Structures are given as structure tokens and as C-alpha cells.
């Protein structure tokens, strides 16, 4: 169950929520608008051999013995039609900044502002307010959370150690905003590149492409 209200966290989103349950055992609460990916994706899905998954990640300890350890992050996504019919008095579930995957909170919608020109929705005064949330139309049929500089509002899904594929490719365009991606191929060369700059692979600039539990690509972009 999502925590009934943001206030019940007491000490804020960094406090573990004792009443939270794992995503796999979660049951949707009637009358609450929930993220569509709340119950449908876990770290175990990265081991799926039939699916290629793109994840935002923070590489925490470089590459050791051909394996990298990364904190994997997600963000809340909602069906467009559910956000468009959301009204004052309804409830919405989301992850606050710094939350873990199982620390979903539910809050009552007390105010809602819509910017149709830019496809923004601000709930309860936006993310800077307690129980507030900002949403952006991501594509034709989903909204996602939004924070400063247009980033999603990330929550941590957990840490996972994964081997680099033998033919792994690093695409690194982090040098400057206009930089062309510099490609490095092969597990040893990619490991050396990551380990040469160990502290600069973060949620905001790093994407891992994973299939069957192996890292096929590492992508890093420039961020301010």
C-alpha cells in the first residue's frame, strides 16, 4: 500500500517507510491515480534475455573484474487521460525526492494548475511545496514527473552488479553541450574509460542499456 499521506512519513522522504510493501505485492488503491510503472517493473527485469532496457543509473564503484555496480533509478509515469481528468479532491500517488521504490506516498489534490501551451500540470503548488508535484507531457500518451532543469523526479530502485558485455559500447558526449559522442568498444576499454573518471557517472548524465543482466551500452551526456 502507498503511505496514506505525505505527512505520515514524519521525517520526510529520506526516512524508511515501515508500512511500505514491495512493488510486486502492491495492490492498486481504488480512487487513487497511480504511476503506470509502479507495480510492473523491478530490478529483476534487467535479467530478462528477451528485453532491452534503458535505465538511468549512477555507477558507484567503477568496473571491477569486468562488472560494474550501479544504483538504478526510476521515475513516475502516468497515463495521459488519468492526469487530464484529475480534479481537486482526487488522490494521486507518487515518489518524493530521495525516496526508494517502495516509498510511494498518496496525497489529496488540493489545487491543480494546467499550462496547456507547454503541457505542464502543477499539483498542490508544485514540487517545492509539501505534497506538491509537477508533471510534463512526455509523449502523446504519458505524463512524467518533472523537477529542476526538466529532469524527472528520480527514485532509487536499488543497486545491482552487472557484467559488461564483451562488445559493450560506451557513447560519451559529456565534454560539452555540442560534443559528438566518442565511442569506445570492448569490455576492457570501456572499463578503463569508466575507471579513469569514477565519480562522474550519475543519474542525470548516465544511461545503461541492459539485456540478460549484461550491460550492452553505457551512454553519458553533458549536463550543466
Task: Give the label of every model feature segment.
Residues 23-224:
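Solvent-exposed hydroxyl-ligand-binding patches built from regularly spaced Ser/Thr
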Amino acid at each position: 500500500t502507498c503511505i496514506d499521506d505525505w505527512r505520515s512519513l514524519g521525517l520526510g522522504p529520506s526516512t524508511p517507510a515501515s508500512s511500505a510493501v514491495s512493488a510486486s505485492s502492491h495492490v492498486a488503491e481504488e480512487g487513487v491515480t497511480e504511476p503506470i510503472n509502479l507495480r510492473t517493473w523491478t530490478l529483476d527485469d534487467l535479467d530478462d534475455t528477451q528485453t532491452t532496457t534503458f535505465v538511468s543509473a549512477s555507477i558507484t564503484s567503477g568496473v571491477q573484474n569486468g562488472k560494474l555496480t550501479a544504483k538504478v533509478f526510476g521515475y513516475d509515469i502516468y497515463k495521459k487521460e488519468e492526469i487530464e481528468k484529475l480534479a481537486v479532491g482526487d488522490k494521486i500517488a507518487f515518489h518524493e525526492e530521495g525516496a526508494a521504490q517502495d516509498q510511494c506516498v498518496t496525497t489529496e489534490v488540493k489545487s491543480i494548475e494546467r499550462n496547456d501551451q507547454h503541457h505542464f500540470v502543477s499539483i498542490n503548488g508544485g514540487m517545492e511545496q509539501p505534497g506538491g508535484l509537477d508533471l510534463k507531457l512526455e509523449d502523446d500518451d504519458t505524463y512524467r514527473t518533472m523537477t529542476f532543469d526538466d529532469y524527472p523526479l528520480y527514485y532509487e530502485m536499488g543497486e545491482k552488479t552487472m557484467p559488461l558485455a564483451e562488445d559493450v559500447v560506451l557513447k560519451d558526449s559529456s565534454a560539452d553541450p555540442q560534443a559528438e559522442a566518442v565511442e569506445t568498444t570492448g569490455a576492457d576499454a570501456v572499463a578503463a574509460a569508466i575507471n579513469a573518471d569514477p565519480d562522474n557517472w550519475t543519474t542525470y548524465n548516465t544511461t545503461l542499456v541492459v539485456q540478460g543482466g549484461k550491460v550492452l551500452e553505457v551512454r553519458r551526456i553533458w549536463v550543466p
